[in-house]
């Protein structure tokens, strides 16, 4: 009786651990009711300023301070002026199926240079330290971006695809221990 009860508990724990309950969205009736919803602007009403914000390589400036090492002098300059620097880059170069990390980072840097050409050339005349910190920041922001399919190529277990295999493995181990 004790082993049977332990097996039931093991089965319950396995089902809870490997079920996709966390990915299920709880949806009520509110998503069907469209009361007090604002009408989305038509594409003819979109201004050039709005279009410029979402083009690939555009800077995201929200005033956040990032944890990046720029060297002693660069760190002091960044600490004092971090609000002037971007804290993100709009870029999604994952549309190509076989893009590598190096190619992705290079195209992100190139797109950022094209999108922000005016700001990069204007600031270049003013301050060399600003330029050095900005370019290092751009390289860092592009290198931390990733494509989801890179994770699928990795050696780790894919959670969604390997759940049945893990469940079978646990049941097999349970039968061996039993």
Curated annotation (Swiss-Prot):
Lipidation feature positions (GPI-anchor amidated glycine): 154
One annotated GO molecular function: copper ion binding
Coiled coil: none
Purpose of the protein: Required for normal acrosome reaction and for normal male fertility. Can bind Cu(2+).
Family statement: Belongs to the prion family.
PANTHER family: DOPPEL PRION, PRION-LIKE PROTEIN DOPPEL
Name by which UniProt lists this protein: Prion-like protein doppel
Gene: PRND
